[in-house]
A protein has these predicted regions:
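A short loop-to-beta-strand structural motif that recurs across blades of beta-propeller domains
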Residues: 53-55, 94-96, 149-152, 192-194, ...
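Beta-propeller domains
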Residues: 45-67
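Short glycine/acidic-enriched loop and turn motifs that connect beta-strands
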Residues: 51-53, 91-93, 139-142, 190-192, ...
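Beta-rich, blade/repeat-based domains predominating
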Residues: 29-42, 49, 68-88, 94, ...
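Bacterial N-terminal signal peptides that target proteins for export
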Residues: 1-8
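Short loop/turn segments immediately following beta-strands, especially the blade-tip
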Residues: 196-203, 303-306
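Bacterial N-terminal signal peptides
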Residues: 8-17
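Beta-strand initiation motifs
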Residues: 21-24, 60-63, 102-106, 154-162, ...
């Protein structure tokens, strides 16, 4: 999640939240704009959108692998080639491909027609066949304005991205079902999640409303920006979505039913999730105060639930 200036001031009083798990442990501190956690071979990779960094935590210490201005590091995904795709939210946005050491291998600044990625790229996910989807965000202003969000697709072996969905209100997180037939997309403005059918050629159809989060959980504050951020899907097809300004992670069934609510004590700006290798724990990136322009935050580890 990245919003320039004052980050969407909340207009209401914070609602009482259920007690956070006593087992919540902070594993990484002092991250400026924590996002994009990915666990690879026991190491946790993550980004800072304010610091413009890609870092690696080995269980004891963090090392910065990449420090690149003009990107606004955000979503991160691992490819089958053991490279990273990185979403850049600076407007216009970019998608970067980097090796595991943070070395830049490739940069896309426009789609196949030459159109710049207006609104910035927010998140990215890799499919089982080697393709990838990325979300187009929107103007990073104090209050949301133009509805220009969409979804881009990079087909396996293709040179360029093509747009496969539009008309989304600040498209944010993106994820794929285990059977590779459904694409989940979060619209932060509106506090809603959408689904699409993934066609054989990677195009999308049958856009449908999946979950309206304020019907599943009480809003913690009144804010334009309270809504779903990034998400991950487990092997059973359950969706774990971070709620920006909500201070929580929601576990949803493939049918959109709320299965569990994880309240995060470390802050209200939950942004993303990674699973431990055995699936028994979640690593959650969280900003303490979403109104903080520096987006000071951390990564916490919490137990998962069945």
């Amino acid at each position: 999640m990245k919003i320039k200036g004052v980050i969407g001031l909340a207009l209401g009083v914070v609602l009482g939240a259920s007690a956070a798990s006593a087992a919540e442990v902070t594993v990484v501190r002092d991250v400026l704009g924590p996002e994009g956690p990915v666990l690879v071979d026991g190491a946790l990779y993550y980004v800072g959108w304010v610091s413009g960094t890609l870092s690696k935590w080995d269980g004891a210490k963090s090392v910065v692998l990449n420090n690149l201005s003009g990107c606004g590091h955000n979503g991160l995904a691992l490819t089958a080639r053991k490279t990273f795709l990185l979403a850049c939210t600076d407007d216009p946005g970019s998608v970067l491909e980097m090796d595991m050491t943070g070395k830049l291998l490739r940069r896309w600044n426009a789609d196949a027609t030459g159109r710049p990625f207006k609104g910035g790229i927010n998140d990215v996910v890799v499919t089982a066949n080697g393709g990838a989807y990325a979300t187009l965000w929107g103007p990073s202003t104090d209050l949301p304005t133009a509805v220009i969000g969409g979804v881009l697709y990079l087909a396996p072996g293709a040179r360029d991205w093509g747009q496969v969905a539009d008309g989304l209100d600040y498209a944010n997180g993106v994820a794929v079902s285990p059977d590779q037939k459904t694409l989940y997309v979060s619209e932060t403005v509106g506090n809603i999640m959408q689904t699409y059918t993934i066609n054989a050629d990677g195009t999308l159809s049958n856009r449908s409303n999946f979950a309206l989060l304020n019907l599943l959980t009480k809003n913690r504050v009144d804010s334009w920006w309270l809504g779903p951020d990034s998400m991950k899907v487990d092997a059973k097809g359950n969706i774990y979505v971070a709620q920006w300004f909500g201070g929580k992670v929601l576990k949803l069934s493939p049918q959109g039913k709320l299965l569990h609510e994880f309240d995060i004590a470390a802050g209200d700006g939950t942004t993303n999730i990674a699973f431990s290798e055995d699936g028994n724990f979640l690593y959650v990136t969280v900003v303490k105060d979403p109104n903080d322009p520096q987006a000071r935050g951390s990564i916490v580890k919490i137990p998962n639930v069945e």
